Amino acid sequence: MLSLDVLLLCAISGFQLLISADGDPMIEVFKWKQLDFYNRGDGYKDLWNRICIPDSHFYNSRKCLGSSSSGSFIQYNNVPQGVTHFRGRLFVTVPRRQPGIPSTLNYIDLAKDGWSQSPHLRAYPNLAVNQYNASEQNLVSVYRTSVDVCGRLWFVDTGMLEFPNNRQQIRHPSIWVIDLANDRLLKRFEIPQSIVEIGRGLASITIDVGARRCNDAYAYIPDLVNRRLHVYHLRSDRIWSFEHSFFNFDPLSDNLNIGGQTFRWDDGIFSATLGSYKPDGSRDVFFHPMASTNEFVVSNRVLQQEFNAARSDHGDDFHLLGTRGPSTQSTMHKYDPRTGVIFFAEVQKSGVGCWKTSKPFSTENHGSVYSNSSEMIYPSDLTIDEEGYIWVMSNSMPIFVYSKLDVEKYNFRIWRQSTLLAKRGTVCE
């Protein structure tokens, strides 16, 4: 009998499941020429969900449907960035880098909309929370999300509108924690100005927590602009920042050619992922700048001690693992405990790479899972869900920034594959 997960995959990917059976490492699940929403905030109503149930844990949640206080809907400006799956819901973020974005945090209900090739997005938890003019408790701009082992959705609201030539820091950046069992806000922590003055560099968040110690969670937040690694501790409700030269971009790796666009980006530390538990209970934290082909590592024990952040010299606590090889610049990466493999979203290769952590870190041991320069243009996010499936978002961002998207072609895609199949046939087996 097919498992529920396999049946769900059949429903949302159709014939492409047969391609996977022949060894294709990534399955294209959804694709869009342009994004659309069940509630654009312009009077276009949610056809599936006209009845709104208020949530007392979110400010003014009765305004689930209706007009937007965040400006008129401009479809072309909506570019997805992050993707995270949890138990039938696929969370999709749309940072406010341009005007006309109705909701920055959204989801796809796979049971209701998984049949569609280009499903409409639903505002999460509702449209009201996504209206940044309504309340300081509402969302401005979210890049990526993360789900921890306690079933909580974590993300950073940058608090910034990144409109070209008109950036506005609407409010301080903040860390949000939502209980996905009931969609209630558990925590909103406003990041002090002494830690971060502007929020546009806070593009990802990684959660370090045990299933039986949910209140003792640590969040690692790379800051690609200020080249820092921020650490937030949930139980003490405190945050501190590490600085290190390893957080800087590599000037020899900042020249990119993606989607026919040639440009230079100086993005510093971009992604952090946790390795397996060691006998002493510690875990390695692997990290890298986006404009770099190097990988670095530090123990989580180092990061979790606030007094360590004040040191002027970190000694040998931070280590260079080595280089992944030419053209392996990566946005996000994620460790999979089932296979012991780290998977990388590789922007220059328009694909997914891998490294098996039991092998020496070297160019020879860095494998290629998938590469497609015409369809997986700029893989902006890569996550792994609790069932062992990789999810990748590709969004053609360089074309959007430096040229013009062809709205008659598919520009945004979400991909999926099990980690067991993804590593098959590579040096990561």
From Swiss-Prot:
GO molecular function: dopachrome isomerase activity; dopaminechrome tautomerase activity
Signal found in the keyword field: yes
Glycosylation sites: N133, N372
Pfam families: MRJP
Biological process (GO), any one: melanin biosynthetic process from tyrosine
Reactions performed catalytically: L-dopachrome = 5,6-dihydroxyindole-2-carboxylate
EC number: 5.3.3.12
Pathway: Pigment biosynthesis; melanin biosynthesis
Gene3D superfamilies hit by this protein: TolB, C-terminal domain
InterPro entries: 6-blade_b-propeller_TolB-like, Royal_jelly/protein_yellow
Keywords (A to Z) from UniProt: Glycoprotein, Isomerase, Melanin biosynthesis, Secreted, Signal
Main location (coarse class): secreted
Intracellular or extracellular location(s): Secreted
Signal peptide: 1-23
Uppermost EC category: isomerase
GO cellular component, one term: extracellular region
Family: Belongs to the major royal jelly protein family.
Protein role: Tautomerization of L-dopachrome with decarboxylation to give 5,6-dihydroxyindole (DHI). Also catalyzes the tautomerization of the methyl ester of L-dopachrome and dopamine chrome. May play a role in melanization reactions during late pupal and adult stages. May play a role in melanization reactions during larval and early pupal stages.
Protein's name according to its UniProt entry: L-dopachrome tautomerase yellow-f
Organism: Drosophila melanogaster (Fruit fly)
